[in-house]
Swiss-Prot record:
Organism of derivation: Methanosarcina barkeri (strain Fusaro / DSM 804)
Entry similarity comment: Belongs to the class-I aminoacyl-tRNA synthetase family. IleS type 2 subfamily.
Lineage, uppermost ranks: Archaea, Methanobacteriati, Methanobacteriota, Stenosarchaea group, Methanomicrobia
Entry function: Catalyzes the attachment of isoleucine to tRNA(Ile). As IleRS can inadvertently accommodate and process structurally similar amino acids such as valine, to avoid such errors it has two additional distinct tRNA(Ile)-dependent editing activities. One activity is designated as 'pretransfer' editing and involves the hydrolysis of activated Val-AMP. The other activity is designated 'posttransfer' editing and involves deacylation of mischarged Val-tRNA(Ile).
GO BP field: isoleucyl-tRNA aminoacylation
Name the UniProt record assigns to this protein: Isoleucine--tRNA ligase
Cofactors, names only: Zn(2+)
Length: 1058
C-alpha cells in the first residue's frame, strides 16, 4: 500500500537508499535486458582522461548523456553503450611527472622508461576507479563493469588496424615538416591540441642588408626574434607595390629602406625617421632578383653558407612592412615556402627548446630566454630598426601550458588533405544539433585542416605500429597483435606498450632487421577509433556489423576540432564514411561572470560538493535546465538553490496526499479513472489535460535535444499547475469521508498525474523518480516492473486532452490573480470571504470560461458569488465622473469658462458620454439658466467604483471585488483566522492527520466572540476538535497554549490531544 514519506526532502538519504536498491535488484542490467527486442541504438561515450576528480564540465557531459539514454530506453530502444576512458598521452604523463617531481624527459630517461610506463598505467587505472564512483554518484547508468579502456591491447589493435588501412590506401606519410612543438614535453602536438591565450612578446623591425647596394636594407617585422638565427629568406607578395625610399633621421643621417608602399608611414613612425624620399617603386616580383646578408652571420656561421633571397608568397599581408622573414624550420607557412623554392630547412633548435651547435654563439641557450640577447645583438650591428612589445593570442601546449614553438622534425602524418572533400561530404550526411555545429563550426574547421601529425615523441601511448629496417630503410605497418607475433616469431604474448613491444623485431627481406620506430600515437588517435574499438573490431565483426556506426554522440564544442574531427578522419581512412549518424554539441561550463573556471582564479566548482549539499538530482536538474545544451553554462549558486527549492516543492506535492490516502486505505488498483468519471470536476479534467500537454511538450523538446525546455516544462508544471493550483483546489476534498466519491475522484486523478509525472522526471531526476515509483506503484502493485526506468515513456492520451478547458483555466487563474490584487487594494485578506466578485469580460471566450469554472472561481477567490457582466459592457454599478479640461474650455468660452466647468462637473457622466458618441455635442445648462454647447475633448471621463469596492485588470477583463462586510462575512472571516492558527498549533505538536483534539479559545472582545460562536461547529470540524470551548473569560490550557493577535483582537488558544 501507499506509505507516508518524510516531511523534508533528504537527497542524501534518498540517493543512498536508491543506489542500494538498484544494486540489489540489478536494475541497470535488467533494464537493458528488458529492451533487447527494441530498435537498436549504439551510443559511443567520448572518453574523459583519467587524470583525477571529475569537474563540472565532465559532470554536465555525463548528465546530458545519461538523460538522453534513459529517455531513449523508455522509448523502447535497445541501447548499447560502454563508458570510455582515455588513459594514455600527455594528460596522464604530465600528472605522473608532477607526482614524481620530474621537470623534463631527461628525468624520465633517468628513472627508466619501463618504470615510468608502469607508473602511468597504475595512475590511470586508479583514477579511473575514483572517477567511476563519482560518475555513479551523479546517477549515470552505463556499463561501468565493462568500460572500454584505451590502454587495453584489444583497443590498441583497432588503432593499429586503422593505421594499416591508411598505409594500404596511401594515406600515411612520413617526413620532415615544421610542426607545433612543446619544448617542455619535447614532442609534437596537433593543431587541435594548441590552446590559445593572451601573451606579450617582443615586436621588432629588423633591417636585412641588401647585397651589392650600399646602405640599403629590406625591413621585416617579427614577434619571434629567436628565429632570426634560422632565417633563410624573405617573402613578399607578388601583387603588392613596394618602394625603395630614403629614410632621414633628425640628425640628418639616412639609409635606404625597402617596404610595401602603403606601409612606409608605419616604418617611418616605428624607426622615428623625420622625413623620406621615394627613390623607386616596384612590384613584389621585381624584388626577387635581390639577395641580402644575414644580420647575425658573424654569430651563426651556418648563415654564411646560405644564399639569402627574396621570394613570392600569396599569404603575405599588407601589415607592418609587407615583408616576411622566412625560417622554414620554425613555421608551417615558412616551411611550405622553403619546400616550394627548395630552400635549406635550417632548424638549429633541439627538442628541449634550446639552440643546438648549429646556432653558433647561441648554442645551449633556451630560445625564449634568447630573445633579448638576439635583440641586443641586432642593435649592436645596427640591424634593429625598432623594438616594442605586442600582446596577442599565442599557442600553448594543451597539457602543460608551455608556449609552443615550431620545429622541423620528422613525423608521421595522415594525409587528411587527400580525403578532405570526402570528409566534407560526410559532414552533410550527419544530423547536427544544433544544425550550425556541423554546417558552420565543424565544416569550417575541416575546410582549413592540414595533414594530421599523428606521431608523438613520448612514452605512455599506443605505439605506432611501424617497423623500419636499419639496413635498407624498408617500412612495414603491422595491423594486429597476431600479425606482430607471427612476423616477429615471438614465442609468447606481449603487452602492446613501450618498452615491451619495442623489443620485438621483424626479419627484413634484405637480411637486415626491422625495429619499431620509437614514436607513439597522438592521444587523439586513441579516441578516434572508439566507435569500432568498443565493438571489439577488428578481432571480431559480429557486433560491428550489427551496431556500427554510432547512432548518437555528444560532447563539448571544443570537440569540433577534437574528437568529432579525429573520429571522422580515422573513420574515413578505415571505412570511407562518418562513424556517427547524429551529433549533439554542448557548451562549456563557466562561472557566473562568464569566465573559464580555473584554480588560479579560485572559481572552480566541484560537482561533488554540489551533490553533497543539494543532491545529484538538483545538480542534474540545474545543469539541464539552466541553458540550451549548446550554449555555455554559467554556473550560478542562486539558481542551483532555486532548482533545489523546486525539487523540494515537487517532494511536498508528492507527499501531500499520502497521509490521507494511507488513512483511507486508498487502493488505485480498485479505483479506476473510468469508475470515477461521473464524479470528476472541471479541475480534475483540467489537470488530466495539462499532464498530457506536458508529455507532448517534453517529447517535442527531446526530439531536438532541447533538454532545457523539457526540464523547465516539468518544473513549471509542478510548481504552477500542481503546487499552486490543483493541490489548492482539491485540498478540502481530501478531508471528507473515506468513501466520498468526490474524494476518490480527486485521489484517482492525482494518482494518475503522479504516475505520469514520475516517469516524466525519471531521465532527468532518476533518484527522486525511483523513490516516487517504489512508493506509488511498486507498493501498490507487486506485478509492476521493478524500476521506473524499465517503464515505457508516457504516451499522450488524446481522450484527456482538452485545450479549450486549459485555456479557460488559464483565464480563471488570471481572474483569481486580479481578484487577489484587488483584495490587497481593498485591504481584505483572502481568508476573509467577500460577498461577490464582478467580472467584466472582454470576449465571449472569457465569459464562457467564467461560466464553466464558476465554482473554481468562487472557491479560489473566497467569494459568495461571481457576477458576470455582458461582454464588452461596463458594470452597471460603476459611476462615471466628468472631468472638465480647462485647456479646451478656456479658449472657447473665455470669461464664461468659470461657469461651464462647475456645470459640467454636475452632469451625469453616462448621459454626457452618450451624447458625445451619438450627436457629437451636448447642450449644457449653466447656473444662470443659459445654455452652451460643449463638444468631445472638453471633458474626460473616469469610472468610479462603488464604496468598499476595488478593481484590477486580468487577461479576461476588469475584475471587481466587493469588500464590504456583513456580520455573516465577518463571522466567517474571524472563524477562518481561528482555524488557521489552530492548524498551525496542530503542526507544531506534530499531530497525525486524523488525530482528534481538545480546544479552548478565549476571545475577550464580546462582539467578536458572538460572531465566532455562530460558526463553532465549522471550527470544530476543520481542526478535528472533539471538544471546543469558547468564551471571553474561560481558562485556557493544553499541551500547547499560545497568545494570538487576530486582526487587532487578542485571543488565547490551547490545544491538547484527546
Amino acid at each position: 500500500m501507499i506509505k507516508e514519506i518524510t516531511a523534508k526532502y533528504n537527497a542524501e538519504q534518498i540517493e543512498k537508499k536508491i543506489t542500494q536498491l538498484w544494486k540489489d535488484s540489478d536494475a541497470y542490467r535488467k533494464t537493458r535486458e528488458h529492451r533487447k527486442t527494441g530498435k537498436r541504438l549504439f551510443f559511443v561515450d567520448g572518453p574523459p582522461y583519467t587524470t583525477g576528480h571529475i569537474h563540472l564540465g565532465t559532470a554536465w557531459n555525463k548528465i546530458i548523456k545519461d538523460s538522453i539514454l534513459r529517455y531513449y530506453s523508455m522509448n523502447n530502444r535497445n541501447i548499447l553503450e560502454r563508458p570510455g576512458w582515455d588513459m594514455h598521452g600527455l594528460p596522464i604523463e604530465v600528472k605522473v611527472e608532477g607526482v614524481l617531481g620530474f621537470k623534463s624527459k631527461k628525468d624520465i630517461e633517468s628513472f627508466g622508461v619501463e618504470n615510468f610506463i608502469e607508473k602511468c598505467k597504475e595512475f590511470a587505472i586508479n583514477q579511473k576507479q575514483e572517477m567511476t564512483e563519482q560518475f555513479q554518484r551523479l546517477g549515470v547508468w552505463m556499463q561501468w563493469e565493462a568500460p572500454y579502456m584505451t590502454l587495453k591491447d584489444d583497443y590498441i589493435e583497432a588503432a593499429w588496424w586503422t593505421l594499416k588501412q591508411a598505409s594500404e590506401k596511401n594515406l600515411l606519410d612520413v617526413g620532415k615538416r615544421s610542426v607545433n612543438w612543446c619544448p617542455r614535453c619535447e614532442t609534437a602536438i596537433a593543431d587541435s591540441e594548441v590552446e590559445y591565450a593572451e601573451r606579450t612578446d617582443p615586436s621588432i623591425y629588423v633591417k636585412f642588408k641588401i647585397k651589392g647596394e650600399e646602405n640599403t636594407f629590406i625591413v621585416i617585422w617579427t614577434t619571434t626574434p629567436w628565429t632570426i638565427p634560422a632565417n633563410v629568406a624573405v617573402a613578399v607578395h607578388p601583387g603588392f607595390e613596394y618602394s625603395k625610399f630614403r629614410a632621414i633621421r633628425q640628425d640628418g643621417s639616412d639609409e635606404i629602406l625597402i617596404a610595401a608602399t602603403d606601409l612606409i608611414e608605419n616604418v617611418l613612425r616605428q624607426g622615428r625617421y623625420v622625413d623620406y624620399e621615394v627613390l623607386e617603386t616596384m612590384l613584389g616580383e621585381d624584388l626577387t632578383k635581390l639577395e641580402y646578408e644575414s644580420p647575425v652571420g658573424d654569430l651563426v656561421p651556418v648563415q654564411n653558407e646560405i644564399k639569402h633571397g627574396i621570394y613570392l608568397a600569396d599569404y603575405v599581408t599588407a601589415e607592418n612592412t609587407g615583408c616576411v622573414h622566412i625560417a622554414p624550420g620554425h613555421g608551417m607557412d615558412d616551411f611550405n615556402v622553403g619546400v616550394k623554392y627548395n630552400l635549406p630547412i635550417l632548424c638549429p633548435v633541439g627538442p628541449n627548446g634550446a639552440y643546438t651547435e648549429e646556432a653558433g654563439e647561441y648554442a645551449g641557450k633556451n630560445v625564449r630566454e634568447a630573445n633579448p640577447i638576439v635583440i641586443e645583438d641586432l642593435r649592436k650591428r645596427n640591424r634593429l630598426l625598432a623594438e616594442g612589445t605586442v600582446t596577442h593570442r599565442y599557442g600553448h601546449c594543451w597539457r602543460c601550458k608551455t608556449p609552443i614553438i615550431y620545429l622541423a622534425t620528422e613525423q608521421w602524418f595522415l594525409k587528411v588533405t587527400d580525403i578532405k572533400d570526402k570528409m566534407l561530404e560526410a559532414i552533410d550526411a550527419v544530423d547536427w544539433y544544433p544544425e550550425w555545429a556541423g554546417s558552420a563550426r565543424f565544416r569550417t574547421w575541416v575546410e582549413g585542416a592540414r595533414d594530421w601529425c599523428i606521431s608523438r615523441q613520448r612514452y605512455w601511448g599506443m605505439p605506432i605500429p611501424v617497423w623500419k629496417c636499419k639496413k635498407c630503410g624498408k617500412l612495414e605497418v603491422i595491423g594486429t597483435k597476431a600479425e606482430l607475433l607471427e612476423k616477429s616469431g615471438a614465442g609468447s604474448d606481449v603487452e602492446l606498450h613501450r618498452p615491451y613491444v619495442d623489443k620485438l623485431t621483424i626479419p627484413c627481406e634484405c637480411g637486415g632487421e626491422k625495429k619499431r620506430v620509437e614514436d607513439v600515437f597522438d592521444v587523439w588517435f586513441d579516441s578516434a577509433v572508439a566507435s569500432w574499438a568498443t565493438l571489439k573490431f577488428p578481432q571480431t565483426r559480429e557486433q560491428f556489423d550489427e551496431w556500427w556506426p554510432a547512432d548518437f554522440i555528444t560532447e563539448g564544442h571544443d570537440q569540433t576540432r577534437g574528437w568529432f574531427y579525429s573520429q571522422l578522419g580515422a573513420s574515413m581512412v578505415g571505412f570511407g564514411r562518418a562513424p556517427y549518424k547524429s551529433v549533439l554539441m554542448h557548451g562549456f561550463t563557466l562561472d557566473a561572470g562568464g569566465k573559464k573556471m580555473s584554480k588560479s582564479l579560485g572559481n572552480v566548482v566541484s560537482p561533488i560538493d554540489v551533490i553533497d549539499k543539494y543532491g545529484a538530482d538538483t545538480l542534474r536538474a540545474y545543469v539541464l535546465s539552466s541553458s540550451a545544451p549548446w550554449d555555455d553554462l554559467k554556473f550560478n549558486q542562486e539558481e542551483v538553490e532555486n532548482v533545489h527549492r523546486s525539487i523540494n516543492i515537487l517532494w511536498n506535492v508528492f507527499r501531500f496526499p499520502l497521509p490521507y490516502m494511507a488513512l483511507d486505505n486508498f487502493d488505485p488498483l480498485k479505483v479506476s479513472l473510468d469508475s470515477v468519471k461521473d464524479a470528476l470536476r472541471e479541475e480534475d479534467r483540467w489537470i488530466l489535460s495539462r499532464i498530457q500537454s506536458v508529455v507532448k511538450a517534453v517529447d517535442e523538446a527531446m526530439s531536438g535535444y532541447f533538454l532545457h525546455k523539457a526540464v523547465r516544462e516539468i518544473l513549471e508544471f509542478t510548481l504552477e499547475d500542481l503546487s499552486r493550483w490543483y493541490i489548492q483546489l482539491i485540498r478540502p476534498r481530501t478531508w471528507t469521508e473515506a468513501d466520498d466519491p468526490d474524494k476518490l475522484a480527486a485521489y484517482r486523478v492525482l494518482y494518475e498525474v503522479y504516475v505520469t509525472l514520475t516517469k516524466l522526471i525519471s531521465p532527468f531526476m532518476p533518484y527522486l523518480a525511483e523513490e516516487m515509483y517504489q512508493n506509488l506503484i511498486r507498493n501498490v502493485d507487486p506485478n509492476a516492473l521493478e524500476s521506473v526506468h524499465m517503464c515505457d515513456w508516457p504516451k499522450v492520451n488524446e481522450a484527456y486532452l482538452d485545450p479549450e478547458l486549459e485555456a479557460a483555466m488559464s483565464t480563471a487563474r488570471s481572474i483569481v490573480e486580479a481578484a487577489s490584487n484587488a483584495r490587497q487594494k481593498a485591504g481584505r485578506k483572502l481568508r476573509w470571504p467577500v460577498s461577490r466578485i464582478v467580472v467584466s469580460p472582454e470576449s465571449e471566450d472569457a465569459a464562457k470560461a467564467v461560466e464553466r469554472l464558476r465554482s473554481v472561481l468562487m472557491d479560489q477567490t473566497n467569494s459568495k458569488a461571481i457576477v458576470l457582466t455582458p461582454v464588452g459592457e461596463s458594470w452597471d454599478e460603476l459611476g462615471l465622473e466628468v472631468i472638465p479640461d480647462p485647456s479646451k474650455i478656456g479658449p472657447v468660452f473665455k470669461k464664461d469658462a468659470g461657469k461651464v466647468i462647475p456645470a459640467l462637473q454636475k452632469v451625469d457622466g453616462f448621459a454626457l458620454k452618450k451624447a458625445f458618441a451619438e450627436a457629437g455635442e451636448f447642450e449644457l445648462s449653466l447656473a444662470d439658466r443659459t445654455t452652451v454647447t460643449v463638444t468631445p475633448g472638453m471633458a474626460n471621463f473616469k469610472e468610479t467604483l462603488p464604496e468598499g469596492t476595488a478593481s484590477a485588470e486580468s487577461d479576461a477583463g476588469l475584475v471587481y471585488v466587493d469588500a464590504n462586510l456583513t456580520p455573516e462575512l465577518e463571522a466567517e472571516g474571524y472563524a477562518r483566522e481561528v482555524i488557521r492558527r489552530l492548524q498551525d498549533m496542530r503542526k507544531e505538536l506534530d499531530l497525525v492527520v486524523d488525530e482528534n483534539i481538545r480546544v479552548s479559545v478565549r476571545i475577550e472582545d464580546e462582539r467578536v466572540l458572538r460572531l465566532v460562536e455562530t460558526l463553532k461547529d465549522l471550527i470544530a470540524e476543520e481542526v478535528r476538535a472533539e471538544i471546543l470551548n469558547l468564551g471571553s473569560d474561560i481558562d485556557v490550557s493544553g499541551a500547547l497554549v499560545k497568545d494570538w493577535d487576530v486582526e487587532g483582537i487578542a485571543m488565547k488558544m490551547g490545544i491538547s490531544k484527546k
